[in-house]
Swiss-Prot record:
Segments crossing the lipid bilayer: none
Tagged with keyword Protease: no
InterPro entries from the UniProt entry: Ribosomal_bL36 (IPR000473), Ribosomal_bL36_sp (IPR035977)
Entry protein name: Large ribosomal subunit protein bL36
Length: 37
């Protein structure tokens, strides 16, 4: 899980979603998981 000020899709399979008011990227590739912090 990377925590960064701006989250972006890295590949085609990345999805930008909102959970508990936080913007997150979920993906099949665990390295692509990101959370806005």
């Amino acid at each position: 899980m990377k925590v960064r000020p701006s989250v972006k899709k890295i590949c085609e399979k990345c999805k930008v979603i909102k959970r508990h008011g936080k913007v997150m990227v979920i993906c099949e590739n665990p390295k692509h998981k990101q959370r806005q912090g």
